[in-house]
Amino acid sequence: MNPEKDFAPLTPNIVRALNDKLYEKRKVAALEIEKLVREFVAQNNTVQIKHVIQTLSQEFALSQHPHSRKGGLIGLAACSIALGKDSGLYLKELIEPVLTCFNDADSRLRYYACEALYNIVKVARGAVLPHFNVLFDGLSKLAADPDPNVKSGSELLDRLLKDIVTESNKFDLVSFIPLLRERIYSNNQYARQFIISWILVLESVPDINLLDYLPEILDGLFQILGDNGKEIRKMCEVVLGEFLKEIKKNPSSVKFAEMANILVIHCQTTDDLIQLTAMCWMREFIQLAGRVMLPYSSGILTAVLPCLAYDDRKKSIKEVANVCNQSLMKLVTPEDDELDELRPGQRQAEPTPDDALPKQEGTASGGPDGSCDSSFSSGISVFTAASTERAPVTLHLDGIVQVLNCHLSDTAIGMMTRIAVLKWLYHLYIKTPRKMFRHTDSLFPILLQTLSDESDEVILKDLEVLAEIASSPAGQTDDPGPLDGPDLQASHSELQVPTPGRAGLLNTSGTKGLECSPSTPTMNSYFYKFMINLLKRFSSERKLLEVRGPFIIRQLCLLLNAENIFHSMADILLREEDLKFASTMVHALNTILLTSTELFQLRNQLKDLKTLESQNLFCCLYRSWCHNPVTTVSLCFLTQNYRHAYDLIQKFGDLEVTVDFLAEVDKLVQLIECPIFTYLRLQLLDVKNNPYLIKALYGLLMLLPQSSAFQLLSHRLQCVPNPELLQTEDSLKAAPKSQKADSPSIDYAELLQHFEKVQNKHLEVRHQRSGRGDHLDRRVVL
């Protein structure tokens, strides 16, 4: 520093002492400055006061020499003390050089800067609030200072500033929030602790409504909640807990919509505490805001659904996620199916599938359902508990369906999540069928694929969804449209039957009984599509047919009309080109028909053949059952067409008898001994009126080798009374009771011809296969 420079009104002694390395001498100089400034205040000499402050600032506090900077700091503090209540007029000039010293490399100098600013603030009190942001900014840096003395000094200043803010009603929160939002993302644990402590203080001040600005800082708070320091996490939990209490207390002033996506992001984090806290907030938001949260459903589901598959290690998160899921589901009502028509202009705002899927961890979605719906977020700022339930919110399904489809397609996802997805789909088809049927073609393949799931419960829920699709009036169209995917389109063309056959199927009205739901649903155009593709899946995945086929078909018979299911499958199988599969499928359907309790009513309907509908069903089943000779006979036994059964067995002599064929005859004999055929066994007592039944059974006996089944049937026939009555002369003339006299519409001769035609086709295919094999064998020998 130039000793000859003029520092007036500061005397040379003061200047010399301010530059001294000893603190005591600098302190003496400060007292002299205080005395000098007091005189200027008494004289109201503002020019000289400003000159003193400027000199101390420019020539000392901002000097290159460290001792000069220390002298400048203590001198500025002395000026503030001397100015007293008038210091508010000069605060900018007093504070700025001191704050500059906060960045000094010398820790002692940073400490003196804290001390000087403490004295300045202590004198000015509330007058410093217009400069709060710069003070806060400086303090936030010192909070992370490595020097313990500096940190201690900054804490004293921090407490003083908090006291001033608490006792004042002039705090400018609007100007402060941008700075808070910026500083809240600091990764330093001391800076985080400093930020949290200030939020707690501001939250406790009655005149400061921090809740209005919660969307600005909520994301930062959740990030601080993941801090490694236990104390900081605890402090942050307290802050978030206080905010949540305020939200519950005053939901009308909460900007739910602006915070929804923030919660969605943190509900997907890997940190258990953050995830649980965010999920608890989401639960409260859904319950308090109601339908306001609907536009964010796809994001919420993206976050919530995976949590439903958590194990007991994350039981708390799982339980809260389940409440969120159930609460959100309840918000969807039948009125949501009508909103597009009531307000057609809003259709344009529906998010596209690309926009609708919420972004994953680390990025927030732009708006409701992940799309930028500014009209929604800007249009709602204040909600009341009552009004939110009736808020005119449009439910857009694109994003929701995409999320559900994505989770159902993910084979790694947990069972409970898949069940929840299927429950959602079922709920949406019940509440908003017209909207959902726009998405059915995209959902259909994955729903069919889910039938191969390992869990019975998943398959049950999947079948409920498929049954609802197949029976909902909203799915009734003139043309169900092309199926999704090339292989499904191929299956459609491969298994499709002519339209008249379909029309006849869909109009079939069977007896409503145990096989039907309480109110048998009307089948729509998707029903036939479902049957076609289900059979196609059984054809391509034989293990599914073997392991789950009976279970799937029995459940469908409970959910839908059993008669329609059997009628349609028989109709489709009649045109199946893979004859081996057709035979296998017919055998499976026949076993289900004869053994399942769910089909008791349908069996009774077929047993009597009293109505035209039952006769038509018999003829339809018969034509497909012809793919398997033994099942055809069992169908005749079920319907008490014993003469035709005998005629069929006579034709067995012309068939190729294989091991599989004999095994099926063996199973039929076992079935005859079951309760299902009790009526048939009792009819053996009436030999006179049932000669063809006995002949048919003897025919089966003659087909069997000497086996356990042969012995079983032989013993049964030995119990028939008066066997000589089998040779009755008038048996060909009389119409036995077993051959329905009241079924003139059934042309049994034509049915027998059809049986021969189908079996010849099977024989031809087998010969073609064996011919190719023989040809290959000959080539090998040569």
UniProtKB/Swiss-Prot annotation:
Region (Disordered): 335-372, 471-517
Tissue specificity of this protein: Ubiquitously expressed.
Keyword Endoplasmic reticulum: yes
Gene from which this protein is expressed: VAC14
Cellular component per GO, a single term: cytosol
Cited Gene3D superfamilies: Leucine-rich Repeat Variant (1.25.10.10)
Span list, region Mediates interaction with the PDZ domain of NOS1: 773-777
Outcome when changing residue 774 to A: Reduces interaction with NOS1
Skewed-composition ranges (Polar residues): 506-517
Protein name (record): Protein VAC14 homolog
Family, similarity comment: Belongs to the VAC14 family.
Disease: Striatonigral degeneration, childhood-onset: An autosomal recessive neurological disorder characterized by sudden childhood onset of developmental regression. Affected children develop impaired movements with dystonia, progressively become non-ambulatory and non-verbal, and exhibit striatal abnormalities on MRI.
Modified residues (N-acetylmethionine): 1
Reported function: Scaffold protein component of the PI(3,5)P2 regulatory complex which regulates both the synthesis and turnover of phosphatidylinositol 3,5-bisphosphate (PtdIns(3,5)P2). Pentamerizes into a star-shaped structure and nucleates the assembly of the complex. The pentamer binds a single copy each of PIKFYVE and FIG4 and coordinates both PIKfyve kinase activity and FIG4 phosphatase activity, being required to maintain normal levels of phosphatidylinositol 3-phosphate (PtdIns(3)P) and phosphatidylinositol 5-phosphate (PtdIns(5)P).
InterPro entries to which the protein is assigned, alphabetical: ARM-like, ARM-type_fold, Vac14, VAC14_Fig4p-bd
Effect upon mutating residue 782 to G: Reduces interaction with NOS1
Lineage: Eukaryota, Metazoa, Chordata, Craniata, Vertebrata
Modified residues (Phosphoserine): 517, 743
Record localization: Endosome membrane; Microsome membrane
Single GO biological process annotation from the record: phosphatidylinositol biosynthetic process
Composition skew (Low complexity), residue ranges: 478-488
Organism of this sequence: Homo sapiens (Human)
PANTHER family, per the entry: PROTEIN VAC14 HOMOLOG, TAX1 BINDING PROTEIN-RELATED
HEAT repeats: 5-42, 89-126, 171-208, 212-249, 438-475, 560-598
Sample GO molecular function, one term: identical protein binding
Record PTM Phosphothreonine, positions in chain: 11, 499
